[in-house]
Amino acid sequence: MADAEASAELPEEARPDGGTLRVLRDMASRLRIHSIRATCSTSSGHPTSCSSSAEIMSVLFFYIMRYKQSDPENPDNDRFVLAKRLSFVDVATGWLGQGLGVACGMAYTGKYFDRASYRVFCLMSDGESSEGSVWEAMAFASYYSLDNLVAIFDVNRLGHSGALPAEHCIDIYQRRCEAFGWNTYVVDGRDVEALCQVFWQASQVKHKPTAVVAKTFKGRGTPSIEDAESWHGKPMPRERADAIIKLIESQIETSRNLDPQLPIEDSPEVNITDVRMTSPPDYRVGDKIATRKACGLALAKLGYANDRVIVLDGDTKYSTFSEIFNKEYPERFIECFMAEQNMVSVALGCASRGRTIAFASTFAAFLTRAFDQIRIGGLSESNINIIGSHCGVSVGEDGASQMALEDIAMFRTIPKCTIFYPTDAVSTEHAVSLAANAKGMCFIRTTRPETMVIYTPQERFEIGQAKVLRHCVSDKVTVIGAGITVYEALAAADELLKQDIFIRVIDLFTIKPLDVTTIISSAKATEGRIITVEDHYPQGGIGEAVCAAVSMDPDIQVHSLAVSGVPQSGKSEELLDMYGISARHIIVAVKCMLLN
């Protein structure tokens, strides 16, 4: 069918008049000028990448998208995610391959939780389609029929270092998108009329996400730079920029502006502040339950307290016990399958604009794969909560590949991230409740084996407050643990007591922030002696965190017990002893400190 015939069959709203088309072209020209000026003024940036997508941006923001300019965080606004190294408000940028996963989370929230009219648009470069996370997101969007999502591939042929593998073979991108179950349009990315039409057509599609594959040219509109290699990420020289700006200005036909369409105001009001459990923990001292199971039970309990609590999992729900939440609230459970990168990105999107309280759970060891997404979540100051189970050598028989021994170090680097490491079921339930109300990212580290409940249901917990479990005026050494190693410290204290050696035992509860006041006061009460014991590698773990906290006090000495080397498979208690973090090793370390 000829383009003219196809255009004639479209309704009037999909066929902007000649005056509107001129304004949209002029808007694209102004966007190019702004990108050139901005990058010249800072001597940094990507003006050629901006230029390739100028018409796309013009059509989206001034003809297609619905939003209130004066209220950019309005819940009814259409969402726009830009992963092309330019700024946007909802998530941090400057990365490649993550934008579509975040957009999936926004679209899923809009379709299934908010049940609202807002739509989600994600602009990507062709270069970032080399990232596997893009295709994780493509599979997710297709599986969940996210027909409120539009992904735009800006196919400008060039990457940072030169031509990309598919260059301008648009049919390759089209076939890939269609193979993933997406409704797909191919369009000339310089043709504002064609762009208006395909974006309108996308709005009519049901049960499928839409991909718009737009053929563009890097540096569009800039003589001798357009479609030229080696200009990626380079501002134009000032003299050349001035000449190019004059050329582009000479092509602008009108000073008229277009106001965006206002959004349809049908998003529900959401209140996710001060979410409280409806009852205290239902455990008795002496009960035995794994903290990973207690976490699953706590999530279900929190879900009852607030209907905006959602849980995502990466095909591990029977091991993380998120299946308990799934059974109670299947409509609020998102199965992300074995795609941890995308799971974290989707969680970021779901939590954006305060629409949900999102918890994402998997084995803590598998989260290393998603560290790039976690890092972006930190830069975005996102309020997502991540649960990592099966931490440390206490995992036991499953072996080293399943044992998270780097996760504390990883999350300690994230700005404003709170790290919970609960010891028993009671403290785990409090960790979940506190995380739901905390600002910034939270990480909850849970343990595989069953452990004994040591706290009463009435015990109160706060972020940054440790628990002193054993203390007396005769204490000689402070032993600091968290999670599984607290039990080893308590066992060591019992054995040393028989030898008239008294130690103070501290359960950190949160590793970040640390309870520095309690640590230092306990150290001073035990003649400056501290032993830390952790089911984690020494690098970046509890020992190093405590050392940093007391580093300004020369009278405090810290000895760290941590896992070293690559662990083997075995029984949990055997491995704790083999790798030097059992009660036996704590006793030896205490006696050595006293001798010195």
Curated annotation (Swiss-Prot):
Top-level taxonomic group: Eukaryota
Cofactor binding notes: Binds 1 Mg(2+) ion per subunit. Can also utilize other divalent metal cations, such as Ca(2+), Mn(2+) and Co(2+). Binds 1 thiamine pyrophosphate per subunit.
Provide the residue positions that the database annotates as binding substrate.
Answer: H46, H232, R292, S319, H390, D398, R448
Q: Where in the cell is it found?
A: Cytoplasm
What the entry lists under Pfam families is as follows: Transket_pyr, Transketolase_C, Transketolase_N
Q: Which family does it belong to?
A: Belongs to the transketolase family.
Q: Which PANTHER family match?
A: TRANSKETOLASE, TRANSKETOLASE-LIKE PROTEIN 1
Q: Report the protein name in the record.
A: Transketolase-like protein 1
Organism phylogeny:
Eukaryota, Metazoa, Chordata, Craniata, Vertebrata
